[in-house]
Amino acid sequence: MNLIFGADGFIGKQLSRQIGSKANCFDINTAYDTKYCDVRKPIEIEFENIAVIYNLAAIHKTPGHAYSEYFETNINGAKNVCNFARNENIDTIVFTSSIAPYGTWEDEKFEDSLPLPTSPYGSSKLVAEEIHKRWQAEKPSERKLIIVRPGVVFGQNEDGNFTRLYRAMKKRQFFYPGRKDTKKAAIYVKDLVRLMVEMAEKEEPGVHIYNTVYA
């Protein structure tokens, strides 16, 4: 059985479809088929035989929130999810971070590149990664931590930059927002969730970080 925190978001909905009946879905929003959970507070839910936690819960829209909100949600959420995993003896967490911890620099980045975040979102995600790493380090031979760092995630119901680009092109109103040579690191949402599930199943105990973008 699997738990998904942040299941009502764009990626969370696709992940719950990928996992199917083996997923228990939680979110602060319950418009979708989810149960209520606010990861900013201690998590008090009861399940047995949980194999994997998928932690997608986050504030990510930039700009759009006060700086403090990114840290309150993304850092407290990481702490509370890890504490829940400790209390329930769950040994696998898949955490969705972002390429934002790398900052806005344009040189090619690898998983071992030095993070240099330039936004509160990127900084909060980097701290959240470290919180998850501390959880794994407590029992390094038993616990498995998968950190995925997606670029721009696109797909049906994304309702973001790719959706706006598609609508503009459909109306023959395409234009370059900013520089014409801007590069975007991206991944299709169904490819992302498929990789997340595969890595949770196949990886050995340890910390595994993946930049999940197309090369």
Give names to the regions the model predicted.
Residues 158-164, 178-201, 207-208:
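Substrate-positioning beta->alpha
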